[in-house]
Amino acid sequence: MPSRRACGAPDPKGRTMEQYKQEFIEFMVESDVLKFGEFTLKSGRTSPFFMNAGAYVTGDQLHRLGIYYARAIHDAFGLDFDVVFGPAYKGIPLSVVTTMAMHELYGKEARYCSNRKEAKDHGDAGILLGSPLKNGDRVVMVEDVTTSGKSIEETYPIITSQADIEVKGLMVSLNRMEVGRGGTMAALDEVRERYGFPTAAIVDMEEVTAHLHGRKVRGRVVIDDGIKAALDAYYERYGAVKEA
């Protein structure tokens, strides 16, 4: 039966989180990308946490970010793809650093691609940046976080209109694990159901909460009992239904 599980509850399957995922969670905190407190989201919800991928700004941060994406893509989708596509704007650097990391880690020679918000009518005219898409291309899409699926709704028709391609999957850095526009499913699950391709995240908020509760990062406890209670209350109200 479907049930709502409090964020950070033990994994019912008893799985152990991979080391790189634990490192990624702390990396987000250290980079001031993932913050805890009280934040008003675009949706109007008051959230006890906020993620801003725009805070990755240094060479080291971007290099490490690409490594984490590449490892997660390898684990979730394998290496049977040709292009890493990142929707404008935040997806542009994500696609670049992930493509570079794929080559560094696995010797994988993928191409990067992104879209422009407005088509260019001079020079390298068109709607795409980076590599053009070709018939038969297998594409992995990368985003920072999917809260409503709106960016996929905008970009999926663009890339599928350029050539006869296959989307192998969508990878995001964080699965917020809260209901999307449909009202019961997580946004990532809604994207998968609507478009028919796999979706995955480097980590989800259940893993984040379990790892950070009571743990010090940079000398301070990131999720204390008060923040944990706020997270549990938030997911009791907005948490997506998961299979037990």
Whereabouts are the PLM-identified features?
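Cationic, amphipathic, low-complexity alpha-helical segments enriched
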Residues: 1-9
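PRPP-associated nucleotide enzymes
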Residues: 3, 13-142, 147-244
